[in-house]
UniProtKB/Swiss-Prot annotation:
Keyword Zinc: yes
Gene Ontology MF, one: DNA-binding transcription factor activity
Organism for this UniProt entry: Arabidopsis thaliana
Zinc finger (C2H2-type): 59-81
Protein name: Zinc finger protein 7
Biological process according to GO: abscisic acid-activated signaling pathway; glucosinolate metabolic process; negative regulation of abscisic acid-activated signaling pathway; regulation of DNA-templated transcription
PROSITE patterns, alphabetized: ZINC_FINGER_C2H2_1, ZINC_FINGER_C2H2_2
GO cellular component: nucleus
Superkingdom of the organism of origin: Eukaryota
Protein encoded by which gene: ZFP7
Location in or out of the cell: Nucleus
Something else known: Seeds over-expressing ZFP7 are insensitive to inhibition of germination by abscisic acid (ABA).
Major location category of this protein: nucleus
Length: 209
């Protein structure tokens, strides 16, 4: 046999080996491509989840259209609106019962019968105070209240604090008028016949009611 025949016989075998080696090399490449596809699919899932988280659900208030991101916050906000409206309705109802037509939660000094401090001071200074105090403003022994003390127990005239009647007594019956002032007490002895005798050695200093 010649060398050309041996070369022709070995050529198909060698070709078959080369083809098998090429197939073995192509297998890892196909596996690598499949792995890349799986990674791409997971990446797409992550992007979808992030998009859903970026756009959360929004709840809007029925009264003021304010937006909230949780139903609990929206419920508390709307409950506050309901309480506010209930209080406003109650105030309006009370105003109608008492005849006031003012807005709720708005009170003025004129509606409550109040007067400023300066106005009260001006009103007090503009009116002169009487010399004799009145019973419904001051007590019995207030400022400038005349008190009459009679020495005669059997006198017919009865004097009460604040009386303006003239003192009419019998002869030689002294009357002491005591007027309380801011500085103290003023004592004035008055006698029916010319006053009290200052030259007497033993004056009568006893007071009788």
């Amino acid at each position: 046999m010649t060398e050309s025949d041996d070369a022709s016989r070995e050529t198909p075998a060698s070709r078959g080996g080369e083809a098998s080696s090429n197939q073995d090399l192509s297998k890892p490449e196909s596996n690598h491509v499949s792995l890349d596809l799986k990674l791409n699919d997971t990446f797409n899932d992550d992007t979808k989840s992030t998009k859903c988280e970026a756009n959360p659900r929004v709840f809007s208030c029925n009264y003021c259209r304010r937006k909230f991101y949780s139903s609990q916050a929206l419920g508390g906000h709307q409950n506050a609106h309901k309480r506010e409206r209930t209080m406003a309705k109650r105030a309006m109802h009370m105003g109608r019962m008492f005849g006031h037509h003012h807005r709720p939660y708005t009170y003025t000094s004129s509606s409550l019968g109040m007067q400023a401090h300066s106005g009260l001071l001006h009103h007090t200074l503009s009116q002169p105070q009487p010399l004799v105090s009145r019973f419904h403003h001051q007590g019995y022994f207030g400022n400038t209240v005349p008190l009459f003390f009679d020495y005669d127990d059997g006198g017919s005239d009865f004097f009460w604090p604040g009386s303006f009647r003239q003192v009419v007594e019998e002869a030689e019956a002294p009357v002491v008028v005591v007027a309380s002032t801011e500085s103290g007490l003023d004592l004035n002895s008055v006698a029916a016949n010319g006053g009290v005798d200052n030259n007497s050695s033993k004056p009568d200093l006893t007071l009788r009611l």
